[in-house]
Amino acid sequence: MMSHSVSLTFPDGSVREFAAGTTGRDVAESISKSLAKKAVAIAISGELRDLSDAVTEGRIEIVTREDKRALELIRHDAAHVMAEAVQELWPGTQVTIGPVIDNGFYYDFAKNEPFTPDDLPVIEKKMREIIARNKPFTKEVWSRDRAKEVFAAKGENYKVELVDAIPEGQDLKIYYQGDWFDLCRGPHMASTGQIGTAFKLMKVAGAYWRGDSNNPMLTRIYGTAWHTQEELDQYLHVLAEAEKRDHRRLGREMDLFHFQEEGPGVVFWHGKGWRIFQSLVAYMRRRLEGDYQEVNAPQVLDKSLWETSGHWGWYRDNMFKVTVAGDDTDDDRVFALKPMNCPGHIQIFKHGLKSYRELPVRLAEFGAVHRYEPSGALHGLMRVRGFTQDDAHIFCTDEQMAAECLKINDLILSVYEDFGFKEIVVKLSTRPEKRVGSDELWDRAEAVMTEVLQTIEEQSEGRIKTGILPGEGAFYGPKFEYTLKDAIGREWQCGTTQVDFNLPERFGAFYIDSESEKRQPVMIHRAICGSMERFLGILLENYAGHMPLWISPLQVVVATITSEADDYGREVAERLRDAGLTVETDFRNEKINYKVREHSVTKVPVIVVCGRREAEERSVNIRRLGSQAQTAMSLDEAVASLSAEAMAPDLKRRSNSRKSV
């Protein structure tokens, strides 16, 4: 028997009955006329739907334009308006697909002559005209045959292909905005006027149809849209800042590294870049002293090991395979460059019998790993194919697991604080659909990590934000993900802590317990920086190249005003080097202001200026990157001050601890 009413639960917990066929707009009007006027969509049990849709049983929310969820609708609708604008301006242009993406939207177009950046202001102007018309979005459901016939008649061949790709039995929705229409799953807001004017078209790019290089090249137009003009302005400001801070540009200006076609996705480190990289490794190495054994596992291993670990089945397409043209015994073997360090560390743990008294065993490695990334995804230091991972694996008992996770957390947070990151978010990623290991093992791991997550939040007294990422765990275990916020508000996921009951079982790893029985250890994967290359890129962008003195690739330049001060300048440089600083000299016959400007471009943090007076007084004049101020002090004071400032945070703590004893 057909139901004649629909039960809806409202955010305040109240439940009301509505007649079948009641729309979202009807429900909004039943609450208040003002709410109905502000409404742009509804959400039924969390799913966004059109206001014009008939409601179904569940929890209902009326979504207004100010709602965070409305931003996706604003961007989606803006993409449709952009497509209409393009076809009004250039009749005959075919529209293909136009999804919402992070911070905006895009649409791909098939046009004889590709769009150029000069076309964007013209399209924007037409979009504002269409939005001002405030035409309603209306939805129709068409048959497959009708849709193909209509789009074919319009010359929209790509739309015909999209219609063919829609599974049988699935509704084929057509959305109108005035006379213009498009194939779309929806939902949309009530009218084009609700989009507002806080949008901007950003750039044009080429894109193959369906992402396949065998298909025609289309023109993609990217745009962004926001609730308010203030939000748009802030976003554009962040983009401008990000461009100024782009680590690829800074890498060139500071002479740190480069990439080239012969080695796609691998870094050519220059002297200064390698110096800063090694400073980062040295710092991390000191932070592990006393707690970890630093090890090194082979770069190339037989595929049988990766088959045992499960990587060959789950990750093979991202691995670099190596075949050996050697003697007969090797001819048929297939090897792979390691994409991860964990299987190698298990082999080290298994080498020799382990007692429960030796646990936890903590193995750390600054391991070079290789993972295939499509060429289009490569992005400077942030996305590479070969990188160094500050990896560690802890082998412990079930009872030690929670304490080890908390110990790792303390180390991770301390490292991030040393590098100047104050805002941290820790999220627990739970089991994905595709995974290895039994549900029982996953239940155990997730229960422990949920408890640890609660402890992290409590111990931080709310300073560390926490959350859950359902289904985002690795295929072999749940994990914590640590996300940093940088100087311009961008978020970077870096550290991970992952409990793994599965890999030790696959490799038959065990220890001897107090009853002389074999027991399987818990394995905890952890990384703090993650990719050292990527973390260095994040640091460069966070500080806009103006690195803290302790990790700056070149800490001081001693520059002379006159050749009469060159001998004194050499003495100053030598004193600073003896104090542990990285120093270069500039005795060229150039004006001092020219020298200062030139070294500022390469982000030298401290310039020590010496002239005739400084040589006579045995003093120096210190200039700082980004400041017009000049500080005069004696040479002894300068050496003491700069050497103290250039000391790494962990070494300062160690020094202060010794002084307090």
From Swiss-Prot:
It is an enzyme of class 6 (ligase). The keyword DNA-binding does not apply. GO terms for molecular function: ATP binding; metal ion binding; threonine-tRNA ligase activity; tRNA binding. Binds 1 zinc ion per subunit. Its EC number is 6.1.1.3. Its cofactor is Zn(2+). Keywords: Aminoacyl-tRNA synthetase, ATP-binding, Cytoplasm, Ligase, Metal-binding, Nucleotide-binding, Protein biosynthesis, RNA-binding, tRNA-binding, Zinc. Zn(2+) binds at residues 342, 393, 525. One of its GO terms (cellular component) is cytosol. One of its GO terms (biological process) is threonyl-tRNA aminoacylation. The keyword Metal-binding applies. It is found in: Cytoplasm. NCBIfam families: thrS (TIGR00418). HAMAP family: Thr_tRNA_synth. Homodimer. Catalyzes the attachment of threonine to tRNA(Thr) in a two-step reaction: L-threonine is first activated by ATP to form Thr-AMP and then transferred to the acceptor end of tRNA(Thr). Also edits incorrectly charged L-seryl-tRNA(Thr). This is Threonine--tRNA ligase. It comes from Rhizobium meliloti (strain 1021).
